[in-house]
Regions:
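Metallocofactor- and cofactor-centric catalytic cores in central/energy metabolism, strongly enriched
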Residues: 2-82, 92, 105-106, 119-187
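A solvent-exposed, charged loop/short amphipathic helix patch at secondary-structure junctions
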Residues: 98-116
Length: 187
């Protein structure tokens, strides 16, 4: 996936420190399962590296994570390390290799023949930033939000097909401006 490399590095670092790790694939159901396991007391801390489920929730598409996504750990006061991985694009289910009319003016890539991935820009990316910070407003503390310096995933890294530094800057500024004071921001 578009976040696999960074996730694998993080897994190695957690293992070196003796943490037991459970990975959830951020495709909607994965995020919902993670939030449920937190509510049931089965998870004691969160490295939430993939927020594409939030973007998809905002736009009502494939990987929508549901209304509780990105809220439970903060409400419970669980330690969190957060990163907006994959939040700059959507995953839209389409007929094979078909570009939806409303997204033809966007940069895009096909993740697979039936998963269309457009880059979010302007007001679109601002909506996602606002939703992320709104979901985090109940965070009690013990949380860090990391803003990556080289893109939010494989598609948005230098040389990536969805690289858009102007949109990244807009997104990050909105995240900075809306981030609750209870969350430490790291760049």
């Amino acid at each position: 996936g578009v976040l696999t490399k960074g996730c694998m590095i993080a897994l190695d670092r957690f293992a070196e420190r003796g943490y037991e790790v459970v990975v959830f694939h951020a495709i909607g159901a994965g995020g919902r399962a993670m939030e449920q396991m937190m509510k049931e007391g089965l998870i004691g801390g969160v490295f939430d590296y993939a927020m594409g489920e939030i973007a998809d929730e905002v736009f009502g598409v494939l990987r929508a994570g549901g209304p509780e996504r990105l809220t439970v750990a903060g409400r419970l006061g669980l330690p969190q390390v957060l990163c907006p991985g994959g939040a700059e694009h959507l995953g839209i289910l389409v007929p094979p290799n078909e570009v939806p009319e409303e997204w033809k003016d966007h940069e895009y890539v096909f993740h697979s023949p039936v998963v269309f991935v457009p880059r979010l820009v302007g007001d679109e990316i601002l909506r996602v930033a606002k939703d992320i910070t709104s979901r985090l407003k109940h965070t009690k503390g013990n949380a860090v939000f990391m803003l990556p310096t080289d893109g939010t995933g494989t598609y948005a890294r230098p040389g990536g097909v969805l690289r858009d530094m102007e949109s990244d800057a807009l997104f990050f500024d909105a995240l900075r401006d809306g981030m609750p004071d209870t969350i430490e921001l790291v760049e």
